[in-house]
């Protein structure tokens, strides 16, 4: 790729990616305001967030395959258009049901955008700069995730919760215009094929059903007991559907995801590292806002600024780990990054209610640094094992691994803390923690907090062991383009 075209492409897709990631984090802070306006319970309004997770998990993988078939430019543009339409519907929603439907439309567009963004970027950067490109994308994700809590507070306070959807729609519209002007299918590594001849419909249906049911069972919005008929049935049916999916994908000549990639040790070990790494690293952005607001006494806006320190560490580390991994290989950065994650998870487990702000922000920064160090090199290692024609489905698969790992990590976190609190008679919802002045509730939460991060430290250490098994993959393909 000559000239600076690859950088034009990067900024074109980065605008939309930033908005889509920010949307996912910004909506959580609006849930209480939405519940108040529609006069519904907080449990009911959480379906606004759950609908997004289900939609993205169900459609991410099939949509990645569609992008490989139909051409990435039009796919990316249609995804952004759907996202904007969904945002406008959410802005004008008259009841909770309409808002949830609008979030499904937004998330479908977001799934299309995220399914193809890595494929587009890797398609225009030369193989020798793959790590640098992925590092830049990881930085964009970090900035988007951090911007959500920072922007949400003042925007909701000044203009109400509906305004957050305009905040995410405006940069996406700019991304649509840029995509029409900049993106060229002949240069971003995509080509148009026959959808009917090649699309794996049965695999897509099995994948959507299995992952939707699995995510729904793990997130447990109905508050079933973990040892209950409904929960056990949910896991068993998910397992049956996943087994059926694997059997079908191995038999069909044009699979949605080529499972034979897992025969490559580099692919299988790096994917395992990614999955476990996101389980071990996802609880920080879920639990720390609760800790900062409920125990340290900071408001929503201040909590967002404190959490930004972690995103700053992730963004900075992604920059140099991505660039340097092109020169020195991915292994060193993956080891060090996951090592930082193990260390900070252990450190988090010793936090108490009067932990100093300096210590909290320092550990958050190191935690973000660790995440940034391993994410881009790990992804580069995985993508090095597949050909350009599979970049779309592989980009979607890697995003799916991240999403499912994060959901499992957050569900594991909530289950451990809720279990400890329940065993000690402290039956208080996490969102109501700041309203309780009972010392027993505080002690029970902190005991669950400590156990949670020790468990996550073990999970992250296992991810580190998987990373040690990941070797450099040498291919005779020409990836220079």
Which stretches of residues belong to each language-model region?
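Central mid-sequence intracellular linker of multi-pass
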Residues: 171-212, 263
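Short juxtamembrane and helix-loop transition motifs at transmembrane-helix boundaries
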Residues: 97, 125-127, 192-198, 296-300
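Interfacial transmembrane-helix termini
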Residues: 127, 225-227
């Amino acid at each position: 790729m000559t000239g600076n075209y690859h950088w034009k492409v990067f900024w074109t897709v980065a605008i939309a990616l930033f908005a889509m990631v920010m949307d996912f984090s910004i909506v959580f802070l609006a849930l209480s305001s939405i519940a108040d306006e529609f006069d519904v319970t907080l449990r009911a309004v959480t379906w606004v967030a759950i609908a997004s997770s289900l939609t993205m998990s169900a459609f991410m993988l099939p949509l990645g395959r569609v992008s490989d078939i139909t051409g990435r430019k039009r796919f990316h543009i249609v995804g952004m258009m759907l996202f904007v339409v969904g945002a406008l519907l959410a802005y004008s929603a008259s009841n909770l049901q309409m808002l949830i439907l609008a979030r499904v439309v937004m998330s479908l567009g977001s799934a299309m955008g995220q399914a193809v963004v890595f494929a587009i970027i890797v398609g225009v950067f030369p193989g020798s700069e793959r790590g640098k490109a992925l590092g830049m994308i990881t930085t964009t994700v970090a900035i988007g995730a951090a911007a959500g809590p920072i922007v949400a507070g003042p925007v909701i306070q000044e203009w109400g919760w509906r305004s957050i959807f305009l905040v995410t729609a405006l940069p996406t519209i700019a991304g649509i215009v840029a995509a029409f002007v900049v993106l060229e299918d002949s240069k971003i590594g995509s080509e148009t094929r026959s959808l009917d001849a090649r699309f794996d419909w049965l695999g897509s249906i099995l994948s959507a059903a299995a992952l939707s049911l699995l995510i729904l069972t793990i997130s447990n919005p109905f508050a079933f007991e973990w040892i209950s008929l409904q929960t056990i049935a949910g896991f068993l049916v998910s397992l049956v559907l996943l087994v059926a999916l694997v059997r079908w994908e191995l038999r069909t000549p044009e699979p949605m995801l080529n499972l034979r990639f897992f025969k490559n040790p580099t692919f299988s070990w790096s994917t395992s590292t990614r999955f476990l790494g996101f389980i071990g690293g996802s609880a920080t952005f879920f639990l720390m806002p609760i800790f900062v607001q409920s125990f340290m006494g900071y408001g929503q806006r201040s909590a967002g600024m404190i959490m930004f320190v972690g995103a700053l560490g992730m963004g900075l580390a992604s920059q140099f780990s991505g660039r340097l991994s092109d020169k020195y290989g991915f292994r060193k950065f993956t080891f060090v990054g996951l090592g930082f994650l193990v260390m900070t998870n252990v450190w988090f487990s010793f936090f108490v209610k009067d932990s100093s702000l300096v210590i909290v922000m320092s550990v958050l920064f190191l935690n973000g640094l660790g995440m940034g160090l391993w994410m881009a090199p790990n992804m580069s290692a995985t993508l090095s094992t597949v050909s350009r024609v599979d970049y779309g489905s592989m980009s979607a698969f890697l995003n799916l691994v991240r999403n499912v790992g994060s959901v499992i990590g957050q569900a594991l976190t909530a289950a451990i803390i809720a279990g400890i609190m329940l065993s000690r008679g402290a039956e208080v919802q996490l969102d109501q923690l700041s309203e309780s002045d009972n010392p027993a509730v505080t002690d029970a939460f902190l005991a669950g907090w400590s156990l949670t991060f020790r468990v996550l430290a073990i999970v992250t250490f296992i991810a580190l062991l998987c990373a040690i098994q990941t070797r450099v993959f040498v291919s005779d393909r020409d990836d220079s383009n």
